[in-house]
């Protein structure tokens, strides 16, 4: 009887872990989709900024503190860029580079939180990734 109870407990824990993993992947993907939409046209609007608070709140429910902090940095940078002017703001190239860098840090924290790897992506690889993305966006 004890073994059966233990097996049931393990199966339930496994299902819970699987569901949590799926939820985390979904919220991380949603955040990347929102940020991608913002950066694709090179402009930020109030409507775009307003899409971020609820994913941040959901992160607090699901993600590690490191993930939350990393995304807050992205959000803070987007707010800083948007705060410069009026209703629709053009994102300067230097601001895009910083946003991409922060998104790369966020991505790395997501990777660790999902236990894809307990080793962070090499900082040099992150730097090259940001450089490649920045170069591609200038064309």
Tell me the role of every PLM-derived stretch.
Residues 1-139:
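Conserved non-transmembrane functional hotspots
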């Amino acid at each position: 009887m004890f073994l059966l109870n233990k097996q049931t407990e393990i199966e339930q824990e496994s299902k819970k872990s699987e569901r949590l993993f799926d939820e985390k992947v979904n919220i991380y993907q949603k955040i990347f989709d929102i940020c991608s939409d913002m950066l694709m046209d090179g402009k930020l609007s109030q409507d775009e900024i307003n899409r971020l608070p609820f994913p941040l709140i959901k992160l607090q429910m699901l993600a590690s503190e490191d993930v939350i902090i990393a995304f807050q940095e992205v959000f803070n940078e987007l707010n800083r860029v948007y705060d410069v002017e009026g209703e629709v703001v053009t994102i300067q190239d230097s601001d895009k580079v910083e946003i991409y860098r922060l998104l790369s840090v966020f991505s790395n924290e997501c990777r660790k939180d999902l236990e894809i790897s307990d080793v962070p992506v090499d900082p040099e690889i992150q730097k090259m990734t940001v450089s490649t993305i920045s170069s591609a966006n200038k064309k």
